[in-house]
Amino acid sequence: MTTPSTPSSAPKNNTSNSTTRAYKVKEHQLYVARPKLWNTLRRLHTVDKPYRRRSFFITRFVTITTFFQWLQRAIYGRRARKISFENNPPIFILGHWRSGTTHLHYAFSRDPRLGYLSNFQTFLYTVALLSKTWLRPVVSRFMPETRPQDNVKVDADAPAEEEQPLSMVSLYTGIHSFFFGRETSYFEKYTLFQGISEEEKAGWQEDYNHVLQQIALYNGTNDLVLKNPWNTPRVQELLELYPEAKFVFIHRNPYDVFLSTRHLMRKMISSQYLQFISMREEEDRVIEWGKAIYERYIAQRSMIPEGNLVEVRFDIFEQNGYTEMERIYKELGLPGWDDAKGPIADYFESVKGYKKNRFRKLRPDLEERIKKEWKTIFDTWNYTTDLNEKT
């Protein structure tokens, strides 16, 4: 990991709104981060007073796992770096965090041909290869039955997104702008690739590809399906690494995306904060980041070779998931449908009783702001801006 330039945004004193949140996740994503990375983050950024206990426990767990992290790299590092995706282009699921990417990923994960990042490997990424045979059953007993933000069922083997383990080993990820909320340059540089140096871009490419190599090694297959909303505006960068990659993009009504993402920020992401941002700042971030992510995807999707992109509408996928999966396999020319269709059908049968969260009505000022700032999103996929008629 190469150390990038220090983010330019300076810490500010921001005490508007209480730091109280309905925390739902006790563990921090950085508990098994690389020691060098965690020390660099602490050197570059201030941890606000309400989160110093959280920082203390990160330091403790990082210290406890340091030897085992070193041992995993010594045993598996060289083997992982030999893995190539030249003849096994990944399938990338793109879309906003709250647009149905998890539902789509869960369906794909039932295909016995495909490997994917599991929750176990996500949570214990830097020691997962070393410990999966004996620690995974232990972790399974302590995992919650559902995700805090949406009540989706989870277990140690359920699919997860690879930006999370990337944040444990690399500075080159926008997730650090979640942890250190005033440091938005991580999002700008490593999600939107704005103001990024060639050295930093090369660092992101190396670190990201190595995460995929580790996922492949863990699964015993180079055929991967990956769900990562942070990748949505990275089409160009992904094609530079994997020119024959397949893409599935899922979109949802923008009002629902906003409400669900704000809920995600307050129920789950806030439990990872190391710097305070107010609830109003969270709303600003949902709108501004959503606009940037979607608009960069729209500008870049034409770069994807014909036949390598399928776009899916969430409300249709929700009602006719099996038919949509069959269409995706056919349009992308994916092999193995005959073996996958049974397990995929079983998955959709298993989630028939699932109930989505219900949210309070949008404030009028937010409704108007979403109409204005997300206009391109409404127009591109033909969503109505009338809340009374939304589909």
Task: Identify what each model region corresponds to.
Residues 71-93, 122-126, 131-134:
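N-terminal signal-anchor transmembrane helix
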Residues 94-96, 225-229, 314:
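Short His-Asn-centered micro-motif
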Residues 110-120:
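Post-Walker A helix-loop "phosphate-sensing" segment adjacent to the P-loop in P-loop NTPases
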Residues 232-235, 255-258, 318-321:
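Flexible loop/turn segments at secondary-structure boundaries
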